[in-house]
Amino acid sequence: MNIKQYLDSTYLKTAEQAGITEEENILVAQEFIQEAIEEHFKLIMIRPNRVSLAKKMINGANSILEIGTVIDFPEGKSAIEEKLKEAVQAIQDGADDLDFVCNYQAFKKGDTDLVKEEILRGTQLGLANNKVVKWIIEVAALSEKEIIQLSSLIKNVIVSNFEQELFSKVFVKSSTGFYTTENNLPNGATVPAIKMMLENASPLPVKAAGGVRTYEEAVAMIQLGVKRIGTSGAKKIANGQNSTNEY
């Protein structure tokens, strides 16, 4: 198993979140991009305002590293048109993967029509531009029943509206890694949540994000059936070490 081809090396902190200056944060992003190039990871996952920087560095290195970015991150509650506008800009800047935060708050309130529309239109935009699309459902904010229902809803929208050969390009993704939980409960991918996603999103692939910090945990997720893992400790995981990073 080449575990590196499952790893989306991830750096999504703002300068404020990292407790550093904007200039310092750009340097951290550059370090993550350079590391991903050198380590031959599948993809570098960064904020939209860093996509053009990554594209420049990757081209300069003649690398095949892919670029992913997040859309409407981390809360996912912007209007559909705002989401699409941000995605269009990311595509223009050179993103290969678009990780949309699903409006899980609207879903929890019962507004499934809104959620279905954003999934349909966001996926149409991504696939029309030959991009991979991922829908983050934020499992830590959902009950078990809601994880099952939202995974199923996404699956049903895709299966009903797109050709079968495109299913592999639309993922259901567990988490942003930025959701605040109570009582120190996990805010990322857990084995029970991933199992529910795999069972109810199939035939769509699943990405586990947040909380995967060791090589053993990554292998366990892959053995369950996930196709991608998002982590800010990709190099340590690939080298069989434990990551102390939050995501």
Where are these regions (language model features)?
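Alpha/beta catalytic cores of nucleotide-metabolism and tRNA/nucleoside-modifying enzymes
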Residues: 1-31, 124, 196-204, 212-247
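Conserved N-terminal beta1-alpha1 strand-loop-helix module at the mouth
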Residues: 1-80, 92, 153
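Hydrophobic faces of well-ordered beta-strands that scaffold small-molecule active sites
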Residues: 2-14, 43-46, 65-72, 98-100, ...
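Glycine-rich phosphate-binding active-site loops on the catalytic face of alpha/beta enzymes
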Residues: 11, 69-71, 80, 92-107, ...
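Glycine-rich, proline-tolerant flexible connector loops at the mouths of alpha/beta enzymes
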Residues: 33-53, 98-116, 138, 172-185
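Alpha-helix-loop-beta-strand connector modules within alpha/beta enzyme cores
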Residues: 48, 52-73, 112-134, 141, ...
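Glycine-rich anion/phosphate-binding loops
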Residues: 75-89, 109-120
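Catalytic cores of alpha/beta
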Residues: 78-92, 142-153, 195-203, 212-228
